[in-house]
Amino acid sequence: MVKIGLYGASGKMAQSIISCLKDEKDATLSVAFSQKNEVENLSSELLTNDFAKFFEACDVIIDFSQKEATVALLNYARTNPKPLVIGTTGLNDDEKNLLHLASGTMPILYATNMSLGVAVLNRIARIASKVLREFDIEIVEQHHRHKKDAPSGTAMTLAGCVAEARDLNLKDVLVTGRAGMVGARSKDEIAVMALRGGDVVGRHTVGFYNDGEFIELNHTATSRATFSKGAIKAAIWLKDQSSGLYSIDDSLGLDD
């Protein structure tokens, strides 16, 4: 039985993970980290705001917190190694570099989306990008009104997949908004547009558009449990891995 430590226990994703762990046969929630004294659906015995106690009480940590909290977790873990599953989005280049640095002494799985469906979508989109080289690529993502980062980490990962498949540097071709007289679309341009509203859990569409035809690939998440179950399975897998930075593809056994 893998002992899971939940970091950022008061968040919506954390609440979903707590619920999913109740039905999990191979893992259990052993401790939860929060600055709050009370967290919904958690007994006070499981709660702590002390890093040392938190790390000691678990085999693997799952983190879906905010980026500042993730940085604090990584900095502590660098001298107290522990397998980490990190799903925090909106990380900048410096924060991603910290991930790489920390993975030198512990196994870290970082993914902007933990669902099997999105992992498959990324694979299919990569293939389509190679084959449909003359097609324009546009990505649209939609989330609930409370999501803080835009475009979503999932959409940016998807954009990275299709750019890499065409041997393009995403930073050189990325467009995240259009307004006014912007001129004609460039050949290599990859656009990522964000919609926000309601309680949409997550919807991502990557379109390949050409004269006379187009293809759109779509993934819709209808419940946060999709991501929670993926994170739990990733944590169970990560427990026995050596130091290094892993992706969700690694945990699913998807080959390049």
Curated annotation (Swiss-Prot):
Gene of this entry: dapB
Positions contributing to (S)-2,3,4,5-tetrahydrodipicolinate binding: H144, G153, T154
Keywords annotated in UniProt: Amino-acid biosynthesis, Cytoplasm, Diaminopimelate biosynthesis, Lysine biosynthesis, NAD, NADP, Oxidoreductase
Protein name as it appears in the record: 4-hydroxy-tetrahydrodipicolinate reductase
Cited InterPro entries: DapB_C, DapB_N, DapB_N_CS, DHDPR_bac, NAD(P)-bd_dom_sf
A Gene Ontology biological process term: diaminopimelate biosynthetic process
Annotated family: Belongs to the DapB family.
Entry keyword annotation includes Cytoplasm: yes
Its biological purpose: Catalyzes the conversion of 4-hydroxy-tetrahydrodipicolinate (HTPA) to tetrahydrodipicolinate.
